[in-house]
Every structure is written in C-alpha cells, then in structure tokens.
Amino acid sequence: MLSKEEVARLLEAAPSLKSKAALSVAYGAGLRVSEVANLKVSDIDSQRMTLRVEQGKGQRDRYVMLSPQLLELLRDWWRAARPQAWLFPGQNPVNPMTARQLCRAVHAAAQAAGIAKRVSPHTLRHSFATHLLEQGVDIRVIQVLLEMAT
C-alpha cells in the first residue's frame, strides 16, 4: 500500500505521458491491470464523467467515475497520441498495452520516485481502496466501486 504522497510522487515520476495516464486511471478509478489495458477511447464519456469498463470480472460492464483532473489528463494523452481504438495501445497499435508493459511502467515510476517498497499496478488499486476507507467511505460502497464479490 502506498500513502497518498507516495502515489502522487509515483504518478509524477511516470516515464511517459501514456504511462502517467494509464497509472492514473489504475489509481483514480481503482481498476485492475487488465481493465486498464483493455480500455478503448470510446469507453470515455466526458459528458457523464464516466469510464466504461467492459467485461470486468464477472463478464459484465460497469461504469466508474472520472474526476475532472483525470479526464483532463486523458484528454492531454489523447491530444498527444491520438490513439484510435485502444486508449493505451501496445507497441503494435492494433493491440492494447500489455499487463507487462504496465508493470514495467509502475516499476520505473516507483524507482524514479525513490519508492523502495514493492509496487505493482495492483498496489495502486489497493491504495485507492485504502484511501477511500481512510476518508470514511463505507466498505460496501468501496466493494461496489471495485466490483468485488461480497
């Protein structure tokens, strides 16, 4: 688990705008690594400030809220890269970014930020949930946000 300050340092130290955006989505929406990797440009609804997560665990779509800051970061990423289908395309743009690429990005960011703890993309999801709990959000609400089985 990372503190809020460590998360902020890690995101700022991300090796690229693409990595920063992908890791920010992982933390800011509490997504699994596979869910981040499989996001499409069309999953962003800037009017409703939501992000559709297709075929998450249980094979059903869900919607997560986007903060204004996260939406602006995604817009910056889109303007810079103009991804076509996948929000975070892989080395071959017809494929999405891989879980391994996201793991490498989080490790590089943690190292650059001077974070000595073992950090993975799942650490960001865990930190998201813990920070909500620390703010007094009901555990059942957090479970719904994370789409966890009760």
Enumerate the predicted regions with their spans.
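Conserved catalytic core of the tyrosine transesterase superfamily
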Residues: 1-150
